[in-house]
UniProtKB/Swiss-Prot annotation:
Family from the record: Belongs to the Mo25 family.
Source organism: Saccharomyces cerevisiae (strain ATCC 204508 / S288c) (Baker's yeast)
Protein name listed in UniProt: Protein HYM1
GO MF, one example: protein serine/threonine kinase activator activity
GO biological process, one term: regulation of DNA-templated transcription
Disordered: annotated segments: 363-399
UniProt miscellaneous comment: Present with 1280 molecules/cell in log phase SD medium.
UniProt biased composition (Low complexity): 363-382
Annotated Polar residues bias: 383-399
InterPro entries: ARM-like, ARM-type_fold, Mo25
Gene, per the UniProt record: HYM1
Highest taxon in the source lineage: Eukaryota
GO CC, one annotated term: mitotic spindle pole body
Length: 399
């Protein structure tokens, strides 16, 4: 069922014969070993011994939980183990000493944690309920990810803890705790880091947190305007300054969120901002076709909005002709009928926008018409230095 390291079967067979344990002893012995890491008299040799013992106890715990022992544990024995682990705050203590553990031990901890989250009794997720009652463990998990980045050579710790966070997000009660924790905002910063694996893991955590439970996110996160403003600021930074993957994934996340009906508050604030429109239009001219398409999924919502803010309307009017030129080549090679229908609709919406009359053009004698044009083409400061934003072709190959 699980990948085994060299000589694991031999080591475990010897260990079981030498140290038979009752279910509750697993938790006690793990805690005893973890406490040794804090001893001021701990030598490097002794630390290695403690690390080895922790790894063995964690492997033994995993085998017991999945019933991979002889004899197989009874349901009562497994219940006893879960109770003992929760009572001793085993996961909290493991996270406190995560940096001290061996790679194999951290991996076993992640597997045990995932198994425990899925364990149910009487239609209740026992470990999930425990973590809800002890949110300090989730908070420590989020902080441990940051601590790992502050230490040299601890990238694997970040990735392991990241997987544990994603497992938590699958459960609405735990996702709620994560969304409320200020530490979540740090992952927007982690997503901008140059390390590909760290950035990707951070984006996966953010995507999971904001999409796994749409009703929870809309009712308890985006119902707060302060959260919306901060989220937009953070996501825009990723879209503007991140790597290609970061730009694409963050734009994709934003697009998926603003089309959810219950996220109207987020959508209305985002699509009525001229600065946001300028950013999206810039992304639509990226050399990557994939990123262009993700940006289009945001742009189409802005254009289709029947109640555009005046600054947004002015930008679209000012760029009307350039947008129409842009869409002559955009997405023509797509076979997606839905996309093609949306593209055609957006082109029609843009084409229906008023045309700007140049100041050098002879003005009509019709005073009413002249007045109307003047009101539409009044100078706008929104598009300073942006006049050529949509002039280049979308022909480069996608990444």
């Amino acid at each position: 069922m699980f990948k085994k390291y060299k000589n694991q079967d031999l080591d475990m067979a010897f260990w079981w014969k030498k140290n038979p344990k009752t279910p509750s002893d697993y938790a006690r012995l793990i805690i005893e070993q973890l406490n040794k890491f804090s001893s001021p008299s701990l030598t490097q040799d002794n630390k290695r011994k403690v690390q080895e013992e922790c790894t063995k106890y964690l492997i033994g715990t995993k085998h017991f939980i999945v019933g991979d022992t002889d004899p197989h544990p009874t349901p009562e024995a497994i219940d006893e183990l879960y109770t003992a682990m929760h009572r001793a705050d085993v996961f909290y203590e493991l996270l406190l000493h995560f940096v001290d553990l061996e790679f194999e031990a951290r991996r076993e901890c992640m597997l045990i944690f995932s198994i425990c989250l899925g364990y149910s009794k009487d239609n209740k997720f026992v470990t999930v309920d425990y973590l809800v009652s002890q949110p300090k463990t989730i908070s420590l998990m989020l902080r441990t990810a940051e601590v790992a980045l502050q230490q040299k050579g601890c990238q694997d710790i970040f990735l392991t803890v990241g997987n544990m966070i994603i497992e938590c997000i699958k459960y609405e009660q735990l996702c709620r705790i994560i969304l409320k924790d200020p530490q979540l905002w740090k992952f927007f910063e982690f997503a901008k880091l140059g390390n590909f694996e760290i950035s990707t893991e951070s984006l996966q955590i953010l995507s999971a947190a904001f999409t796994a439970h749409p009703k929870l996110v809309s009712k308890e996160f985006f119902s707060n305007e302060i959260n919306i403003i901060r989220f937009i600021k953070c996501i825009n930074k990723l879209m503007a300054h991140g790597s290609y993957v970061t730009k694409r994934q963050s734009t994709k996340l934003l697009a998926s969120l603003i089309v959810i009906r219950s996220n109207n508050a987020l959508m209305n604030i985002y699509i009525n901002s001229p600065e946001n429109l300028k950013l999206i239009m810039t992304l639509m001219t990226d050399k990557s076709k994939n990123l262009q398409l993700e940006a289009f999924n945001v742009f189409k919502v802005m254009v289709a909005n029947p109640r555009k803010s005046k600054p947004v309307f002015d930008i679209l009017v000012k760029n009307r002709d350039k947008l129409l030129t842009y869409f002559k080549t955009f997405g023509l090679d797509s076979q997606d009928s839905t996309f093609l229908d949306e593209r055609e609709f957006i082109v029609q919406e843009i084409d229906s926008l008023p045309r700007i009359i140049s100041s050098t053009t002879e003005v009509s004698n019709n005073n009413a018409s002249s007045s109307n044009v003047a009101s539409i083409t009044s100078p706008s400061s929104v598009m300073n230095n942006q006049s050529s934003i949509l002039t280049h072709s979308t022909s480069p190959d996608s990444r």
